[in-house]
């Protein structure tokens, strides 16, 4: 399964083509739209989330509520485009452009992208580098999550800590309803209240905040990924996908950085066996991956999200046209997008997992894949 996205932040729409989905996957807009809604929620978001009401539209590959085996085409319209139609006009002659951006923003793609592609209006960088693109990747991830759900896999994204505040209530699958209702997708109401206070303070001061996001999956079969080739190792693929999220600057599988400061005897998960459970672990400090493959334990992917780079009290920069000192450009932005980023991490991790399932089990139809997964589960139980 592979996919491609297109579209700009203030263009008419976002687009995606997904190739390699099996025929017979039940799929409707209601499998995708709730994930788009989750991405738009979260305390600390900006006015753009008031304007947009993201809804997916199928353009190809789905008929009668099921995939046909052909490429699936998705679209999400940008409601804000009506306010930018003249500025984003693709027709020749639309130069010099209105609202040209020449003051590169520190922490953004503006300067490096401008130098790479020769743009003096940095809007040509900003529009595609924007995190708005992740709306479509969440839609693709929702399709992957639907496929995984039919294979017995469940995923969730949440926030273990942000704005310098750590949740003291550890994650539990029983807390998923609480996470879904939380404005910050946190497990701990007290930590949440303090984080909200800090978000309000940062907003009043024209500043931004980052945090830690985590995606968890249960129900995975062991053996997804491979130890044979470096590019098939699942932890590497998950890390690349996580680091492709705008503002994510670090990733770990399980408590990797904590593990790095301990002895091996304190870190590695002992192996046990019983007739009822087969092989299992009493701990999961590996985060569900060993040797580039799933172990069958819960998969834990954690990432660090830096504070958003667009500041209402901008940092010093230089104008790329005049080379004169200037304050960085200000665009409408969020104070924090950490809760939304946890949803994005879950969706994007699901894409990697769906790809791994399809690579291992193949099949042109969903029914074939389900049968092969069940036979594999039986073989693993008998191992």
From Swiss-Prot:
Reactions mediated catalytically: 5-O-(1-carboxyvinyl)-3-phosphoshikimate = chorismate + phosphate
SUPFAM superfamilies named in the record: Chorismate synthase, AroC
Cofactor note: Reduced FMN (FMNH(2)).
Pathway(s) per entry: Metabolic intermediate biosynthesis; chorismate biosynthesis; chorismate from D-erythrose 4-phosphate and phosphoenolpyruvate: step 7/7
The entry's keywords: Amino-acid biosynthesis, Aromatic amino acid biosynthesis, FAD, Flavoprotein, FMN, Lyase, NADP
Cofactor(s) it depends on: FMNH2
Class of enzymatic activity (EC top level): lyase
The EC number(s) this enzyme carries: 4.2.3.5
Binding residues annotated for NADP(+), in chain numbering: 39, 45
Single GO molecular function: FMN binding
GO biological process: amino acid biosynthetic process; aromatic amino acid family biosynthetic process; chorismate biosynthetic process
One Pfam family of this chain: Chorismate_synt
Residues noted as binding FMN in the record, renumbered to the chain: 128-130, 291, 306-310, 332
Annotated GO CC locations: cytosol
PANTHER family, A to Z: CHORISMATE SYNTHASE
The protein's assembly and partners: Homotetramer.
Function: This reaction introduces a second double bond into the aromatic ring system.
Annotated family: Belongs to the chorismate synthase family.
Protein name: Chorismate synthase
Species this chain originates from: Thermus thermophilus (strain ATCC 27634 / DSM 579 / HB8)
Lineage: Bacteria, Thermotogati, Deinococcota, Deinococci, Thermales
Gene (UniProt): aroC
């Amino acid at each position: 399964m592979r996919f491609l996205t297109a579209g700009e932040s203030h263009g008419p729409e976002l687009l995606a083509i997904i190739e390699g989905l099996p025929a017979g996957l039940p799929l409707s807009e209601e499998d995708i739209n709730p994930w788009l809604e989750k991405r738009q929620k979260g305390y600390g978001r900006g006015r753009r989330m008031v304007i947009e009401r993201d809804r997916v539209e199928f353009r190809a590959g789905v008929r009668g509520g099921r995939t046909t085996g052909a490429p699936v085409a998705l679209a999400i319209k940008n409601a804000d485009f009506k306010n930018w139609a003249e500025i984003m006009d693709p027709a020749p002659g639309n130069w010099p452009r209105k609202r040209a951006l020449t003051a590169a923003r520190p922490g953004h793609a503006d300067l490096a992208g401008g130098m790479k592609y020769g743009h003096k209006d940095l809007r040509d960088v900003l529009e595609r580098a924007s995190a708005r693109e992740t709306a479509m990747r969440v839609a693709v991830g929702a399709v992957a999550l639907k496929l995984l759900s039919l294979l017995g896999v469940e995923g969730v994204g949440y926030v273990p800590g942000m704005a310098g505040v750590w949740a003291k209530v550890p994650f539990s699958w029983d807390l998923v309803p609480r996470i879904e209702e939380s404005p910050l997708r946190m497990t701990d109401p007290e930590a949440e209240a303090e984080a909200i206070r800090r978000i309000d303070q940062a907003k009043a001061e024209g500043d931004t905040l980052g945090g830690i996001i985590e995606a968890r999956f249960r129900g995975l079969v062991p053996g997804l990924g491979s130890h044979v080739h470096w590019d098939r190792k699942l932890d590497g693929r998950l890390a690349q996908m996580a680091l492709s999220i705008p503002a994510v600057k670090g990733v770990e599988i399980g408590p990797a950085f904590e593990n790095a400061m301990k002895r091996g005897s304190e870190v590695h998960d002992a192996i046990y066996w019983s007739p009822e459970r087969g092989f299992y672990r009493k701990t999961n400090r590996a985060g569900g991956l060993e040797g580039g493959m799933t172990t069958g334990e819960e998969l834990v992917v954690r990432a660090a999200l830096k504070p958003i780079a667009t500041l209402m009290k901008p940092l010093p920069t230089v104008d790329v046209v005049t080379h004169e000192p200037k304050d960085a450009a200000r665009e409408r932005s969020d104070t924090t997008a950490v809760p939304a980023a946890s949803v994005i991490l879950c969706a994007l991790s699901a894409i990697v997992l769906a790809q791994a399932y399809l690579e291992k089990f193949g099949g042109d139809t969903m029914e074939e894949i389900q049968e092969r997964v069940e036979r594999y589960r039986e073989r693993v139980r008998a191992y």
